[in-house]
Amino acid sequence: MKNRFRLALLGATLTGLMVTTAMAAPADKPHVQFETNMGSFVVELEPKAAPKTVANFMQYVKSGFYQGTIFHRVIPGFMIQGGGMNESMEEKDTKAPIALESRNGLTNKRATIAMARTSDPNSATSQFFINVANNHFLDAARAADGQGYAVFGRVVSGMQTVDAIAAVRTQSKGWHDDVPVRSVIIKKVSVIKGK
């Protein structure tokens, strides 16, 4: 009788531990911190919704690729774009482009980060943009090209820095428009939580 009671108690304890562990272990969402010459901000990534995009972005982060790049395209009330050019407006060499993950349930709303690309839907490499307004017309369901832009995370702290960047004065430089007059430099991007 005592042995049956002990077995029942042990079984109940193990079941409780498994349920508690499952409930306490939500999907790991990495947090990445951007340090710029205008302040810092933190982005939470969505690897479940955009696994290829997040894996690609994290490879660039971990390799130090973004250090010394700039936000080269800034449009107030729309977005800030960076992650591919240096202060001389020269594009850095990138890895191969990735497949578009724009139909992942995430939308281009204020404070989200998405991959920049050319007119080819599967051309995203290192460049990204942060929406400073709700830009739902960039979602696959509403985009003029039927493809849209892949959101893969959101700013969870430091949005005031993003807004400050979005408010800088811009100019045309070479064949680029909307280039900040004073360079907005990404000093460092690092993983501060998750893998």
What does each model-identified segment do?
Residues 2-8, 16-195:
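Cyclophilin-like peptidyl-prolyl cis-trans isomerases
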